Amino acid sequence: MKRLNLILLYIFCLLPLAAQRPPKHEVRAAWVTAVYGLDWPRTRATTPEGIRKQQAELIEILDKLKAANFNTVLFQTRTRGDVLYKSAIEPYNSILTGKVGGNPGYDPLAFAVAECHKRGMECHAWMVTIPLGNRKHVAALGKESVTKRKPAICVPYKREYFLNPGHPQTKEYLMSLVREVVERYNVDGVHFDYLRYPEHALRFSDSYTYKKYGNGRDLAQWRRDNITEIVRYLYKGVKALKPWVKVSTCPVGKYRDTSRYP
């Protein structure tokens, strides 16, 4: 009996230690931001030397992240209606060459994936989803902008443009971009950003699609359902292509801030 009691006591003493063990696979991730060149790049890839410098700048960032014990890089792959990989759907972001659609002479996403993997880090394609940029940005994209190619799924709001989450073709358009990335690149994950309506969007111009697809739901619930459906559709689409690719999203970080969104 004493022996049994000692065994039980030993087990109970170990339980708190087991509860405090870190997860087997801890994610230590950092964003590498390309929009406005906030993190990268500083140099334009317009010459062979420019290409080498631009690549070296990214390598320097990855080396620092590796030294700081990060194991996951969220590499900005789509910004606002433009991209940082060779796409048949949207143009290259001008930050690479100084020109909208300008070919940088290499594939930034392929390069980022290869360099991350050399350092034992995962590379996730970070894709901004719903926002398409302000009027100036959209005008600069010209006929390459999705607002010109697929105006039915785009909505102007407060001097900016957005994909309309309530239009059924929006999730299909986003999936076409995701499909390019997942099928053609050895990414370890896809990370969705701004997968939500814009702030204070009570007057967001989606009344037509609401009347057509609302099916009796109140506006707020319908909008929530739209976002849920897009997330579900993209998640299932990724898993159907490559089940091992991780899917994540960047939601609003503070609960008290959620009132700003419909």
Enumerate the language-model features and the residues they cover.
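Active-site-adjacent "subsite" loops/lids of carbohydrate-active enzymes
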Residues: 25, 33-56, 114, 125-184
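Catalytic domains of carbohydrate-active enzymes, especially glycoside hydrolases
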Residues: 53-82, 184-187
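Aromatic-lined carbohydrate-binding/catalytic grooves of carbohydrate-active enzymes
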Residues: 68-104
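Polysaccharide-binding and catalytic clefts of secreted carbohydrate-active enzymes
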Residues: 70-71, 119, 144, 148-262
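Aromatic- and glycine-enriched glycan-recognition loops and surfaces
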Residues: 47-68, 95-119, 225-233
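Glycine-rich, aromatic-flanked loop segments that form ligand/cofactor-binding clefts
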Residues: 22-30, 70-81, 107-154, 191-193, ...
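Bacterial Sec-dependent N-terminal signal peptides
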Residues: 1-20
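Solvent-exposed loop/turn segments at secondary-structure junctions
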Residues: 35-38, 79-83, 129-133, 196-198, ...
